[in-house]
């Protein structure tokens, strides 16, 4: 999930990157710090930590904030039904051009989601919810889609300080600046606290420095 189409600089930058038009995408963090946004990461091979996590997926799979859908497309090759979900139409179109077979151009909590067995919130995509309350709502929506025994695969990077970091950010690409938006960076303990009211329980976790990869399920043991 990214910004509205008229200001969808991330989606536009992804499309340009895939076509070989390599211009830097910047992430402006209020009140003024600017960071390079690594577009190559959206197209990188799946890592060993990600593979270990994706081995736990059961179909149908809902890939939330899929972007070019590198995880969903990998699961397709394993014979699983994988649905890419993104608010960015350019990202959805790009994922389709790269081979994604099923997609949904929508926000995860804007309406009923297709039934799923596994939901993906990888690459820190819980942050798309913007706030702790928004994250709790997103986790509830995914629990409703997955149902009893459903699985949630999450990865991200813990903040330098504390369990949660709420930020206001915007994308800057070429001569354009997107709208300011809320972003949430959550460490694994915070993710588990936010997920617990919806019934999600930790089943597997791995860490490497500040990065983490975790699998949760809805109450039913595996």
Predicted regions: what is each one?
Residues 88-89:
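Conserved SAM/SAH-binding beta-strand->alpha-helix loop
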Residues 135-148:
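A short glycine-rich, Lys/Arg-flanked "PGG" loop and its adjoining helix->strand segment in the class I
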Residues 148-156:
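Conserved beta-strand signature within the Rossmann-like core of class I S-adenosyl-L-methionine
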